Curated annotation (Swiss-Prot):
Gene from which the chain derives: Fut1
Subcellular location: Golgi apparatus, Golgi stack membrane
Residue ranges the record marks as coiled coil: none
Tissue-specific expression: In the adult, highly expressed in pancreas, testis and epididymis and to a lesser extent in thymus, lung, stomach, small intestine, colon, spleen and uterus. Not expressed in brain, heart, skeletal muscle, kidney, liver and bone marrow. Expressed in epididymis and testis.
Origin species: Mus musculus (Mouse)
GO CC, one annotated term: Golgi apparatus
Pfam families linked to this entry: Glyco_transf_11
Protein name per UniProt: Galactoside alpha-(1,2)-fucosyltransferase 1
Function: Catalyzes the transfer of L-fucose, from a guanosine diphosphate-beta-L-fucose, to the terminal galactose residue of glycoconjugates through an alpha(1,2) linkage leading to H antigen synthesis that is an intermediate substrate in the synthesis of ABO blood group antigens. H antigen is essential for maturation of the glomerular layer of the main olfactory bulb, in cell migration and early cell-cell contacts during tumor associated angiogenesis. Preferentially fucosylates soluble lactose and to a lesser extent, fucosylates glycolipids gangliosides GA1 and GM1a.
């Protein structure tokens, strides 16, 4: 008669224990595995990249640090469905898309996922937490599509589609301001960017006497393609020399020993047009649009902000806090831009607007000018 050895008995006992534990775990959590089909996915920690075919995968941060937070938050059992947004535009645009997706998904009880392209744009700069949508799942999901306009509407509070792909270029505080602290956490700089910006700022001095500044004012001057787009497409202007002078004087009148830290994608123009006679202006940005992290970090580590136009300046001001001066009324009243842009939804009520000088545009589009009459004929 065969008698099992002690080793065989131990192995059999261990096998029974494993099967029992697995059965208990399945019955305890099994409903959670398949409740939402494609929406419920295997989520990975920040330092794991799963190789097996799973519904959703979190990509690792390209700049993983010991103090980095996980990119995949614990998923709330109250959230269902799968929402995402089509990334588009540049750095500030994608920040607006990220924040709007997060806010609308929470408002409607849905789980938000970002596209790999958005993760690649934002994760090198911020410790973002939204998980990343696997491309294969993206291609198989029966999406409903919604193009967002750039202000919060009541209809966005009652969106019932469980699989929704948003699009557009939302960047209005009306979507996410009620979650301001959460948004600030999402857009927390990686330590090396924050510390690098603070190191640069700590070494700045005012004038020949080397006065240590009491107040740091970040200045973002948007130029680049806007020099053509604003006047030719939108009947608008960008911030000019006179506007920047007024904005700086506004801060000089209200803050002791301010220093102005200028960043721009048109630094040559800034060097030639910004008045440096007070000895309180520093041209610190590198203007590299492909790697915006350093310029953005500098702006957000300042106490206050001067912005011209654009989402990059908006986000710098929003995250820096403090006082913000912005360029107001920068288009003609009949501009098509005002059909997609509402100033009251773009700028916080406490921010200070300085009206743009529209006289060059008014002369250009004056219907009674001889060349305008010639065009009409």
């Amino acid at each position: 008669m065969w008698t099992p050895s002690r080793r065989q008995l131990c192995l059999a006992f261990l096998l029974v224990c494993v099967l029992s534990a697995g059965s208990f775990f399945f019955h305890l959590n099994g409903g959670n595995f398949f409740r939402n089909g494609l929406t419920l996915s295997v989520l990975c920690s920040d330092y794991h990249l799963l190789k097996s075919p799973v519904a959703m995968v979190c990509l690792p941060h390209p700049l993983q640090t010991s103090n980095g937070s996980p990119s995949c938050p614990e998923q709330s059992s109250s959230l269902s469905g799968t929402w995402t947004i089509t990334p588009g535009g540049r750095f500030g645009n994608q920040m607006g898309q990220y924040a709007t997706l997060l806010a609308l998904a929470q408002l409607n009880g849905r789980q938000a996922f970002i596209q790999p392209e958005m993760h690649a744009a934002l994760a090198p700069v911020f410790r973002i937490s939204l998980p990343v949508l696997d491309p294969e799942v993206d291609s198989l999901t029966p999406w409903q599509h919604l193009v967002l306009h750039d202000w919060m509407s009541e209809e966005y509070s009652h969106l019932e589609d469980p699989f929704l792909k948003l699009s557009g270029f939302p960047c209005s505080w009306t979507f996410f301001h009620h979650l301001r602290e959460q948004i600030r956490r999402e857009f927390t700089l990686h330590n090396h960017l924050r510390e690098g910006a603070q190191y640069l700022l700590s070494g700045l001095r005012i004038g020949p006497a080397g006065i240590r500044p009491h107040t740091f004012v970040g200045v973002h001057v948007r130029r680049g393609d806007y020099l053509e787009v604003m006047p030719n497409r939108w009947k608008g202007v960008v911030g000019d020399r006179a506007y920047l002078q007024q904005a700086m004087d506004w801060f000089r009148a209200r803050h002791k020993d301010p220093i102005f830290v200028v960043t721009s994608n048109g630094m040559k123009w800034c060097l030639e047009n910004i008045d440096t006679s007070h000895g309180d202006v520093v041209f610190a940005g590198n203007g590299q649009e492909g790697t915006p992290g350093k310029d953005f970090a500098l702006l957000t580590q300042c106490n206050h902000t001067i912005m011209t136009i654009g989402t990059f300046g908006f986000w710098a001001a929003y995250l820096a806090g403090g006082d913000t001066v912005y360029l107001a009324n920068f288009t003609l009243p009949d501009s098509e831009f005002l059909k997609i842009f509402r100033p009251e939804a773009a700028f916080l009520p406490e921010w200070v607007g300085i009206n743009a000088d529209l006289s060059p545009l008014q002369a250009q589009f004056d219907p009674w000018k001889p060349d305008s009459l010639f065009r009409l004929v």
